[in-house]
Amino acid sequence: MRTKRHYVQIDPDVLERVRQIDLLSYLREFEPSNLVKVKGTSNVYCTAEHDSLKISNGKWYWWSRGFGGYSALDYLIKVKEYDFVEAVEILTGQTMA
């Protein structure tokens, strides 16, 4: 069970770096078995978990749910349902205590 945290300060430089991580790069590094190239396309991917979640040109859109984003941070919060601090911790590999 995830625990609720109170205010956590995140260094602005760390936050800027985290926001720059695109979803395709994140999946290639941390969830390669979840990344699937869409047949018949040159640069469109989806996830094994959600075939209607398409990734292309630095952005992603989950067609069956009607929302999308640009970064891995957006994906972890909107799709994987991590809170903001948990998502930052995943992307940095550090605890933000």
Give residue spans per PLM region.
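N-terminal structured subdomain of primase-like DNA metabolism proteins
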Residues: 1-97
